[in-house]
Amino acid sequence: MILIYDINTEDNDGKRRLVKIMKTSRKYLSHVQKSVFEGDITEGQISLLKKEIMAIVNMKKDFVIIYSLRDGVKLNREILTDTPDPTDNFL
């Protein structure tokens, strides 16, 4: 799955939400780039992640997208630059 978020940080509450969302996402997924996370997690973990995120976000100010792939569907991941892959250190 891929998780992407844009948290409104115009006020201190937004800045706190941003940190909480990042920490929550890191519990389940690999941090790929600023507000982008990816990983292969179970349906149960997806449910927990969604529940935790929904408890943090401001529904009127923040934006969160989750891309999920159904079982058996393979996602081709291609890095187009020469920079190191930030997920290389994960097992």
Curated annotation (Swiss-Prot):
Signal peptide: none annotated. CDD domains: Cas2_I_II_III (cd09725). It holds the Pfam family CRISPR_Cas2. It comes from the Bacteria. It is an enzyme of class 3 (hydrolase). GO terms for biological process: defense response to virus; maintenance of CRISPR repeat elements. Disulfide bonds: none annotated. The keyword Nuclease applies. GO terms for molecular function: metal ion binding; RNA endonuclease activity. The keyword Mitochondrion does not apply. SUPFAM superfamilies: TTP0101/SSO1404-like (SSF143430). Belongs to the CRISPR-associated endoribonuclease Cas2 protein family. Homodimer, forms a heterotetramer with a Cas1 homodimer. This is CRISPR-associated endoribonuclease Cas2 2. It comes from Moorella thermoacetica (strain ATCC 39073 / JCM 9320).
